Amino acid sequence: MPHSPLLLIKEKQMYQLRIIAGPCQHESLSQSSHIAEKCKAICDKHGVEYIFKASFDKANRSSLGNKRGVGLANTLNDFKLIKEVHGVKTLTDVHDIDQIEMITTYFNECVDVLQIPAFLCRQTDLVQAACATDKIVNIKKGQFLAPWDMKGILSKCDEAKELWITERGTSFGYNNLVVDFTGIDYMLNNFRVPVVFDATHSVQKPGGLGGSSGGNRDYVPGLCRAASALGVTNFFLEVHPDPDNAPSDGPNMLRLDDFESVVADIATINAVV
């Protein structure tokens, strides 16, 4: 990186408006392709850069019997087709160094952004392995971390081609998260990296349904408007055509039909902030 991510800046960060969106987990080529096509068209309409996201393995599940995904090879082969057909960049999360090596060895052209999950954000070997690739790296801030604690994580990332950090809510008692906008403001003004706001995981209720996580997608639009007003220019949204029947994170995923209204609000507010 030309500058250490620990350098502090006072001026407003000026990054292109960007939205990362897609299903929680990749279920099929037809579904993911449909989501990517619709999301890209909406983002293009509103002058927003679009990146498609999906997980090949939801390793962090509340219960053993919950569906985890269709696997790395199946997912990333479909990513290649989605990239070719729709002309989009792609993001997926990794959970161990072997997965990073598999991606860079056999599926390097299929993935543009490697994401470090929130619960793994302090795993030094994993973070450094991702940063040693030619990929953009997005690190999700753990629900258990203070915003300024990201400084220690960023100190591990000097080799990264490009680095982002994501706010996805903070633990607030049992089975609950809260969004602390003062923390987002701190990261925007103290770290020389783009700060992404994950609005859909921020409304999650971890383990809130007993055997799975709950959530309330109704709060997503308002949180996006607030983040945009604060100056956030990078957003992460999980979207699905039928979230109530999705295999994971259904309660907090945005309905695909509601995606455009959220994008329009973000773009409108961003234009005047």
Pin down the residues of each PLM region.
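N-terminal amphipathic alpha-helix/helix-capping segment at the start of soluble metabolic enzymes
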Residues: P2-I20, V273
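Glycine-rich anion/phosphate-binding loops
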Residues: H26-K38, V70-N74, G214-G222
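Alpha-helix-loop-beta-strand connector modules within alpha/beta enzyme cores
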Residues: C39, K67-T90, A130, D185-V195, ...
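Catalytic beta/alpha-barrel core
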Residues: V70-G71, V88-Q99, V111-D125, I136-P147, ...
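Catalytic alpha/beta core domains of metabolic enzymes, predominantly
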Residues: D134-V239
